[in-house]
Amino acid sequence: GIQSDIDNKAVDSQTIFELGSVSKIFTATAGAYAKSQGKLSFQDHPSKYWPELQKSEINKVSLLELVTYTSGNLPLQFPDNVKTDQQVLEYFQNWHIKNPPGQYRQYSNPSIGLFGEITARSMKVPFTSLLENVIFPKFNMNHTYINVPKEQKEYYAFGYDQMNQPIRVSPGALDAQAYGVKSSLPDMLKFLNANLNPEKSNSDFKKAILETHKGYLKLGNMTQALGWETFSYPTTLAILQESNSEKVVMRSNPVVKETTQEKSKVFHK
Protein backbone atom coordinates (compact mmCIF):
# COMPACT_ATOMS: atom_id res chain seq x y z
CA GLY A 1 0.00 0.00 0.00
CA ILE A 2 0.91 3.66 -0.07
CA GLN A 3 1.13 6.17 2.75
CA SER A 4 -0.48 8.94 0.71
CA ASP A 5 -1.85 9.60 -2.76
CA ILE A 6 -0.03 12.91 -2.66
CA ASP A 7 3.47 11.49 -3.10
CA ASN A 8 2.77 7.74 -3.55
CA LYS A 9 5.20 6.96 -0.74
CA ALA A 10 5.08 3.27 0.11
CA VAL A 11 4.00 2.06 3.55
CA ASP A 12 6.91 0.67 5.56
CA SER A 13 7.84 -0.16 9.15
CA GLN A 14 8.11 3.55 10.02
CA THR A 15 4.64 4.48 8.75
CA ILE A 16 2.41 5.90 11.50
CA PHE A 17 -1.32 5.15 11.37
CA GLU A 18 -4.28 6.60 13.26
CA LEU A 19 -5.70 3.85 15.50
CA GLY A 20 -9.19 5.30 15.98
CA SER A 21 -11.13 3.51 18.71
CA VAL A 22 -8.30 1.05 19.36
CA SER A 23 -7.03 4.03 21.38
CA LYS A 24 -9.64 3.13 24.01
CA ILE A 25 -7.63 0.03 24.96
CA PHE A 26 -4.68 2.25 25.90
CA THR A 27 -7.01 4.46 27.95
CA ALA A 28 -8.35 1.40 29.76
CA THR A 29 -4.80 0.12 30.31
CA ALA A 30 -3.83 3.47 31.81
CA GLY A 31 -6.75 3.21 34.23
CA ALA A 32 -5.85 -0.36 35.14
CA TYR A 33 -2.25 0.73 35.72
CA ALA A 34 -3.39 3.60 37.96
CA LYS A 35 -5.44 1.06 39.91
CA SER A 36 -2.42 -1.24 40.26
CA GLN A 37 -0.48 1.72 41.68
CA GLY A 38 -3.18 2.44 44.25
CA LYS A 39 -4.06 5.78 42.67
CA LEU A 40 -7.73 4.98 42.08
CA SER A 41 -10.43 2.37 42.57
CA PHE A 42 -12.92 1.44 39.87
CA GLN A 43 -15.63 1.96 42.49
CA ASP A 44 -14.63 5.61 42.91
CA HIS A 45 -16.77 8.42 41.53
CA PRO A 46 -15.57 11.32 39.35
CA SER A 47 -15.67 14.11 41.94
CA LYS A 48 -12.96 12.43 44.01
CA TYR A 49 -10.56 13.58 41.29
CA TRP A 50 -12.58 16.37 39.65
CA PRO A 51 -14.28 18.24 42.54
CA GLU A 52 -16.34 20.47 40.23
CA LEU A 53 -18.46 17.40 39.43
CA GLN A 54 -19.47 16.88 43.07
CA LYS A 55 -23.10 18.03 42.76
CA SER A 56 -23.78 16.64 39.28
CA GLU A 57 -25.57 13.43 38.32
CA ILE A 58 -22.44 12.12 36.60
CA ASN A 59 -21.02 11.73 40.11
CA LYS A 60 -23.50 8.90 40.71
CA VAL A 61 -21.63 6.89 38.06
CA SER A 62 -18.57 4.82 39.05
CA LEU A 63 -15.31 4.72 37.11
CA LEU A 64 -16.07 1.09 36.20
CA GLU A 65 -19.39 2.17 34.71
CA LEU A 66 -17.62 4.86 32.69
CA VAL A 67 -15.03 2.49 31.21
CA THR A 68 -17.68 -0.15 30.40
CA TYR A 69 -20.08 2.37 28.80
CA THR A 70 -22.80 1.77 31.39
CA SER A 71 -23.29 5.29 32.77
CA GLY A 72 -26.97 5.25 31.92
CA ASN A 73 -27.17 7.89 29.21
CA LEU A 74 -23.84 9.13 27.80
CA PRO A 75 -24.11 9.25 23.98
CA LEU A 76 -21.77 8.06 21.25
CA GLN A 77 -20.32 11.55 20.74
CA PHE A 78 -20.23 14.90 22.48
CA PRO A 79 -22.62 17.49 21.01
CA ASP A 80 -20.95 19.54 18.26
CA ASN A 81 -20.89 22.65 20.45
CA VAL A 82 -18.74 20.98 23.14
CA LYS A 83 -15.13 21.74 22.27
CA THR A 84 -13.19 23.41 25.10
CA ASP A 85 -12.23 22.02 28.51
CA GLN A 86 -14.74 24.37 30.15
CA GLN A 87 -17.50 23.19 27.80
CA VAL A 88 -16.62 19.57 28.64
CA LEU A 89 -16.95 20.34 32.35
CA GLU A 90 -20.27 22.11 31.85
CA TYR A 91 -21.55 19.24 29.72
CA PHE A 92 -20.91 16.73 32.49
CA GLN A 93 -22.26 19.11 35.15
CA ASN A 94 -25.56 19.39 33.26
CA TRP A 95 -25.85 15.77 32.13
CA HIS A 96 -28.75 13.65 33.43
CA ILE A 97 -29.09 9.92 34.04
CA LYS A 98 -31.75 8.12 32.01
CA ASN A 99 -31.19 4.42 32.82
CA PRO A 100 -29.84 2.98 36.09
CA PRO A 101 -26.01 3.02 35.97
CA GLY A 102 -24.47 -0.39 35.37
CA GLN A 103 -27.56 -1.88 33.72
CA TYR A 104 -27.48 -0.57 30.14
CA ARG A 105 -24.51 -0.39 27.76
CA GLN A 106 -24.31 2.54 25.37
CA TYR A 107 -20.99 2.77 23.48
CA SER A 108 -19.71 6.25 24.18
CA ASN A 109 -16.67 8.43 23.55
CA PRO A 110 -17.63 10.85 26.37
CA SER A 111 -17.87 7.90 28.77
CA ILE A 112 -14.39 6.48 28.20
CA GLY A 113 -13.13 10.01 27.64
CA LEU A 114 -14.13 10.99 31.17
CA PHE A 115 -12.62 7.75 32.50
CA GLY A 116 -9.32 8.68 30.87
CA GLU A 117 -9.43 12.23 32.20
CA ILE A 118 -10.14 10.96 35.73
CA THR A 119 -7.29 8.45 35.41
CA ALA A 120 -4.87 11.22 34.47
CA ARG A 121 -6.06 13.39 37.36
CA SER A 122 -5.53 10.48 39.76
CA MET A 123 -1.93 10.23 38.49
CA LYS A 124 -1.56 14.05 38.64
CA VAL A 125 -0.38 14.37 35.02
CA PRO A 126 -2.08 15.41 31.76
CA PHE A 127 -3.57 12.46 29.91
CA THR A 128 -1.27 12.85 26.90
CA SER A 129 1.77 12.77 29.20
CA LEU A 130 0.45 9.68 30.97
CA LEU A 131 0.25 7.76 27.72
CA GLU A 132 3.35 9.11 26.00
CA ASN A 133 5.65 9.04 29.05
CA VAL A 134 4.34 6.05 31.01
CA ILE A 135 2.03 3.66 29.14
CA PHE A 136 3.64 3.58 25.68
CA PRO A 137 7.17 3.10 27.13
CA LYS A 138 5.92 0.23 29.29
CA PHE A 139 4.81 -1.50 26.08
CA ASN A 140 8.23 -0.56 24.61
CA MET A 141 6.35 1.38 21.93
CA ASN A 142 8.83 4.02 20.81
CA HIS A 143 6.96 5.31 17.74
CA THR A 144 3.48 5.72 19.20
CA TYR A 145 2.02 9.13 19.93
CA ILE A 146 -0.94 11.29 20.77
CA ASN A 147 0.77 14.26 19.13
CA VAL A 148 2.96 13.14 16.23
CA PRO A 149 6.31 15.00 16.52
CA LYS A 150 7.38 17.30 13.71
CA GLU A 151 10.28 15.02 12.79
CA GLN A 152 7.87 12.08 12.37
CA LYS A 153 5.31 13.88 10.19
CA GLU A 154 6.81 12.49 6.97
CA TYR A 155 5.86 8.98 8.14
CA TYR A 156 2.29 9.91 9.16
CA ALA A 157 -0.18 8.19 6.80
CA PHE A 158 -3.32 9.96 5.62
CA GLY A 159 -6.81 8.58 5.83
CA TYR A 160 -9.25 9.16 2.98
CA ASP A 161 -12.83 10.37 3.19
CA GLN A 162 -15.85 9.31 1.12
CA MET A 163 -14.74 11.70 -1.63
CA ASN A 164 -11.28 10.07 -1.61
CA GLN A 165 -9.72 13.24 -0.19
CA PRO A 166 -6.84 12.97 2.34
CA ILE A 167 -7.88 13.70 5.93
CA ARG A 168 -6.54 13.58 9.46
CA VAL A 169 -8.47 12.69 12.59
CA SER A 170 -10.56 15.67 13.67
CA PRO A 171 -9.71 17.31 17.01
CA GLY A 172 -12.51 17.13 19.55
CA ALA A 173 -13.46 17.04 23.21
CA LEU A 174 -11.46 14.37 25.09
CA ASP A 175 -10.25 13.10 21.71
CA ALA A 176 -6.93 11.73 23.00
CA GLN A 177 -8.74 9.40 25.40
CA ALA A 178 -11.26 8.07 22.86
CA TYR A 179 -9.55 7.97 19.47
CA GLY A 180 -6.29 9.93 19.54
CA VAL A 181 -3.47 7.36 19.40
CA LYS A 182 -1.21 7.01 16.36
CA SER A 183 1.23 4.10 15.99
CA SER A 184 3.39 2.02 13.67
CA LEU A 185 3.02 -1.65 12.75
CA PRO A 186 6.12 -2.78 14.71
CA ASP A 187 4.84 -0.97 17.81
CA MET A 188 1.39 -2.52 17.48
CA LEU A 189 2.98 -5.97 17.24
CA LYS A 190 4.69 -5.20 20.57
CA PHE A 191 1.30 -4.22 22.00
CA LEU A 192 -0.30 -7.45 20.77
CA ASN A 193 2.58 -9.54 22.07
CA ALA A 194 2.28 -7.94 25.51
CA ASN A 195 -1.44 -8.78 25.59
CA LEU A 196 -0.88 -12.33 24.36
CA ASN A 197 2.02 -12.90 26.79
CA PRO A 198 1.38 -10.62 29.78
CA GLU A 199 3.57 -12.77 32.03
CA LYS A 200 6.59 -11.31 30.21
CA SER A 201 5.79 -7.80 31.44
CA ASN A 202 7.00 -6.56 34.82
CA SER A 203 4.67 -7.32 37.69
CA ASP A 204 2.78 -4.03 37.99
CA PHE A 205 2.17 -3.76 34.25
CA LYS A 206 1.28 -7.44 33.94
CA LYS A 207 -1.44 -6.80 36.51
CA ALA A 208 -2.74 -3.85 34.47
CA ILE A 209 -2.81 -5.81 31.21
CA LEU A 210 -4.64 -8.74 32.79
CA GLU A 211 -7.12 -6.30 34.36
CA THR A 212 -8.15 -5.11 30.89
CA HIS A 213 -8.91 -8.70 29.86
CA LYS A 214 -11.43 -9.25 32.66
CA GLY A 215 -15.05 -9.38 31.54
CA TYR A 216 -17.57 -7.35 33.54
CA LEU A 217 -20.81 -7.33 31.53
CA LYS A 218 -22.47 -9.45 28.89
CA LEU A 219 -24.52 -8.27 25.92
CA GLY A 220 -25.68 -11.28 23.94
CA ASN A 221 -22.57 -13.22 22.94
CA MET A 222 -20.28 -10.28 23.63
CA THR A 223 -18.53 -9.65 26.94
CA GLN A 224 -17.46 -6.12 27.82
CA ALA A 225 -13.96 -6.04 29.24
CA LEU A 226 -11.89 -2.86 29.71
CA GLY A 227 -11.30 -1.35 26.29
CA TRP A 228 -11.68 -4.78 24.74
CA GLU A 229 -14.83 -6.65 23.81
CA THR A 230 -14.37 -10.43 24.08
CA PHE A 231 -16.09 -13.61 22.90
CA SER A 232 -15.90 -17.25 23.88
CA TYR A 233 -13.47 -19.18 21.68
CA PRO A 234 -14.26 -20.44 19.12
CA THR A 235 -16.70 -17.87 17.79
CA THR A 236 -18.31 -17.17 14.42
CA LEU A 237 -18.23 -14.38 11.86
CA ALA A 238 -21.95 -13.82 12.41
CA ILE A 239 -21.40 -13.22 16.13
CA LEU A 240 -18.57 -10.76 15.44
CA GLN A 241 -20.69 -8.91 12.88
CA GLU A 242 -23.58 -8.74 15.34
CA SER A 243 -21.29 -7.04 17.87
CA ASN A 244 -20.62 -4.32 15.29
CA SER A 245 -24.26 -3.87 14.34
CA GLU A 246 -26.09 -0.55 14.46
CA LYS A 247 -28.05 -1.81 17.47
CA VAL A 248 -24.92 -2.53 19.52
CA VAL A 249 -22.89 0.51 18.45
CA MET A 250 -25.59 3.18 18.32
CA ARG A 251 -28.22 2.18 20.89
CA SER A 252 -28.59 1.57 24.60
CA ASN A 253 -28.90 -2.15 25.40
CA PRO A 254 -29.54 -4.01 28.67
CA VAL A 255 -26.61 -6.03 29.98
CA VAL A 256 -26.10 -8.69 32.62
CA LYS A 257 -23.18 -8.89 35.00
CA GLU A 258 -20.51 -11.38 33.91
CA THR A 259 -19.64 -13.81 36.71
CA THR A 260 -17.56 -16.37 34.79
CA GLN A 261 -14.24 -15.72 33.06
CA GLU A 262 -13.64 -17.74 29.90
CA LYS A 263 -10.21 -19.37 29.69
CA SER A 264 -10.13 -19.05 25.90
CA LYS A 265 -11.27 -15.77 24.38
CA VAL A 266 -11.45 -13.93 21.10
CA PHE A 267 -10.42 -10.30 21.66
CA HIS A 268 -12.01 -7.62 19.53
CA LYS A 269 -12.01 -3.85 19.22
Q: What residue ranges belong to the model's regions?
A:
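Short active-site loop at a secondary-structure junction
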Residues: 6-65, 97-111, 176-179
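Short, surface-exposed loop or secondary-structure junction motifs
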Residues: 2, 56-268
